[in-house]
């Protein structure tokens, strides 16, 4: 089948129709299934043969997309995006996927596709080729392919979406890297950076699934802050956090910092955001996120993909206990952030050494002991006292926690 179709491919490009493209996509899907079957059976020779055919088909589709920009009129919307986004990354056969996939991630996010589900499907598919080919087949797969590709390129070890992140961990990094770079950009300019963060967070969020609200909200909150110097300050610490934290947690840190800043600057907006992110009553987490995000960051250092995302809610729940236990801590901590944005640089260092929610506090106290040592030591017991000085902030956090 594939050979016969391949022989038919050389037909004039003028004859290319939607049916032809659909046949090519169907064939690619069949090839992917065959490759998976042969891989499971250990038949490498057949896998190589089918992969070559698949690669040729993808290159052919990419050539059509490049030569005929008018193909959009012939192709349905999803296939068109696939042709535009997918072929470039697809034709590259995965090695360079990491690069294009990120671009396609932003594109797909801009298109409003659900990257998370796509990513999941893609990762479920397994091999890059499979996801790549599927990408050619449908826009969503394309998006997911890009995500998975970028994830693979950046670092498979990092899962970015809670449930999704487990399957999509690599993708998370790709999106995260984009997000981090964008956050850096954000640092450069608040409105633009916030916009980028929203886009990046949308990628990352889509990868993470539920986190979309939180991240998107975080950028939104940042946007709400607009050009507030506080948000810039938050961004500065964010950038260091993100580099050290490898992306997803970085985003959260930055966002949380934003939130904390937002708390101080635009508390009202921050509240709805956190609540939105945790509509299921995790609102307190959102606020606690500022503190536990650090913990999650530390965890992300330990096992960035699993803890941060696998935890997803579980982390939140785990951290909830720790956070709720250290809710005052969180409150004070976020408060610390307000007064001690200076400590953020130190915190960044603290984040690096901190490996785990509990260890975070200890490590923060240790590495950041100067800054957080007093805060967290007091947080553990006297946190209530510190919270008292920050009674208004506590009230906010209390609301969130509630």
Swiss-Prot record:
Stretches for region MFD domain: 252-323
Q: Where does the protein end up? A: Nucleus; Chromosome, Centromere, Kinetochore
Annotated region Methionine-rich intra-molecular domain: the residues are: 149-238
Query: Which top-rank group of organisms is this from?
Result: Eukaryota
Look up the record and give one Gene Ontology term from the biological process aspect: dendrite development
**Compositional bias of type Low complexity: which residue ranges?**
85-106, 233-251, 311-375, 390-402
| Biased segments, Basic and acidic residues type | 296-305
Q: How does it assemble?
A: Homodimer. Dimerization may be necessary for its function in neuronal dendritic development. Interacts (via C-terminus) with CREBBP (via N-terminus), EP300 and SMARCA4/BRG1. Interacts with the nBAF complex. Association with CREBBP facilitates transcription while the association with SMARCA4/BRG1 suppresses CREST-mediated transcription in resting neurons.
Q: Name the protein family.
A: Belongs to the SS18 family.
Protein known as? Calcium-responsive transactivator
Q: Taxonomic lineage per UniProt?
A: Eukaryota, Metazoa, Chordata, Craniata, Vertebrata
Gene, per the UniProt record: Ss18l1
């Amino acid at each position: 089948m594939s050979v016969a179709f391949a022989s038919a491919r050389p037909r004039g490009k003028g004859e290319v129709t939607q049916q032809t493209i659909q046949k090519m996509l169907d064939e690619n899907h069949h090839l992917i299934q065959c490759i998976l079957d042969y891989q499971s059976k250990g038949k490498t020779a057949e896998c190589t043969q089918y992969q070559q055919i698949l690669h040729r088909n993808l290159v052919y589709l990419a050539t059509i997309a490049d030569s005929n920009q008018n193909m959009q009129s012939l192709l349905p919307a999803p296939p068109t995006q696939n042709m535009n986004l997918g072929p470039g990354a697809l034709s590259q056969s995965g090695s360079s996927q990491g690069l294009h996939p990120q671009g396609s991630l932003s594109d797909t996010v801009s298109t409003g596709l659900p990257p998370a589900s796509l990513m999941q499907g893609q990762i479920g598919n397994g091999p890059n080729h499979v996801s790549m080919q599927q990408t050619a087949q449908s826009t969503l797969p394309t998006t997911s392919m890009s995500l998975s590709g970028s994830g693979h390129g950046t670092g498979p070890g990092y899962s970015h979406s809670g449930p999704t992140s487990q399957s999509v961990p690599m993708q998370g990094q790709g999106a995260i890297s984009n997000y981090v770079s964008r956050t850096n950009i954000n640092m450069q300019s608040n409105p633009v950076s916030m916009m980028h963060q929203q886009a990046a967070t949308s990628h990352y969020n889509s990868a993470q699934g539920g986190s979309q609200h939180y991240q998107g909200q975080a950028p939104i909150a940042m946007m709400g802050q607009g050009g507030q110097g506080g948000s810039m300050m938050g961004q500065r610490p964010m950038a260091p956090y993100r580099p050290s934290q490898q992306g997803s947690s970085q985003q959260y840190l930055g966002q949380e910092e934003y939130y904390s800043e937002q708390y101080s600057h635009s508390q009202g907006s921050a509240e709805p955001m956190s609540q939105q992110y945790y509509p299921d009553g995790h609102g307190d987490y959102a606020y606690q996120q500022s503190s536990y995000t650090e913990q999650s960051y530390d965890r992300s250092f330990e096992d960035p993909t699993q803890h941060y995302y696998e935890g997803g809610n579980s982390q939140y729940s785990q951290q909830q206990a720790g956070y709720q236990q250290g809710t005052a801590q969180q409150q004070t901590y976020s408060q610390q952030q307000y007064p001690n944005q200076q400590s953020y640089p130190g915190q960044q260092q603290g984040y690096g050494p901190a490996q785990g929610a509990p260890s975070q506090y200890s490590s923060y106290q240790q590495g950041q002991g100067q800054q957080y040592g007093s805060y967290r030591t007091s947080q553990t017991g006297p946190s209530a006292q510190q919270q008292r000085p920050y009674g208004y902030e506590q009230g906010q956090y209390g609301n969130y926690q509630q």
